[in-house]
Design a protein with these regions (language model features):
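A hydrophobic alpha-helix adjacent to the NAD(P)-binding/active-site core of NAD(P)-dependent oxidoreductases
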Residues: 37, 82-83
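N-terminal Rossmann NAD(P)H-binding glycine-rich loop of SDR-like oxidoreductase domains
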Residues: 7-19
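Rossmann-fold scaffold of SDR-type NAD(P)-dependent oxidoreductases
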Residues: 7, 61-71, 105-113
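Catalytic loop of short-chain dehydrogenase/reductase
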Residues: 74-76, 106-175
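Rossmann-fold cofactor-recognition segment
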Residues: 33-47, 68
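Conserved Rossmann-fold cofactor-binding substructure of NAD(P)-dependent oxidoreductases
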Residues: 42-61
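Hydrophobic positions on the long internal alpha-helix
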Residues: 93-101, 168-169
Length: 175
């Protein structure tokens, strides 16, 4: 059976993904900041690097899949966290685990992005995220002057982060 790493596996969608994979006989690695097999804060570069290092130590032979479910809602009242976890954390883990996925040949990556409704989409921010995804600090500075207690702003940033993630995945996936 396969080896799958799942972010956000201690609750919500991630927990259900782990449950289904384990029922099918697969080995799972729960990556979560609370109670994971690998405990790390994916909203900061040090936490992301910890995950990448531990995945390489645990499974140098490779991964069959990487399923990225970790995220926070627009109502979390921390605009920087929305972007750093939902977008930057996810793409950093994909990039850092890419060589492990390549080793297995038929590996897959799945991201959770439920930004179907794009009525309040900050397309400008989605474009900035996609075109400058190597400059996290500068992008986080752009949102630091916005009102964290404004639910509409939080939701717009959430949708932009998830839409940008979906676009990033499409740009980097095999055709």
């Amino acid at each position: 059976m396969g080896v799958y790493a799942i972010t956000g596996g201690s609750g919500g969608i991630g927990l259900r993904v782990i449950s289904q994979l384990e029922k099918q006989g697969h080995e799972t690695i729960n990556i979560d900041w609370k109670t994971g097999d690998i405990q790390a804060d994916l909203s900061i570069p040090e936490g992301r690097q910890k995950v990448i290092d531990e995945l390489h130590e645990l499974h140098p032979e490779g991964l069959d899949g990487l399923i990225l479910c970790a995220g926070v809602p627009g109502s979390c009242h921390d605009l920087r966290l929305i972007l750093s976890l939902n977008f930057f954390g996810t793409i950093s883990i994909i990039k850092g685990a890419y060589d492990l996925l390549e080793k297995k040949g038929g590996s897959c990556v799945a991201t959770v992005s439920n930004a179907i409704s794009q009525g309040d989409l900050r397309m400008d921010l989605a474009d900035i995220l996609n075109n400058n995804n190597e400059d996290e600090l500068r992008i986080l500075d752009l949102v630091s002057n916005l009102d964290e207690n404004d639910l509409l702003t939080g939701n717009r940033l959430y949708v932009a982060s998830k839409y940008a993630l979906a676009r990033w995945v499409r740009r980097h996936s095999a055709s």
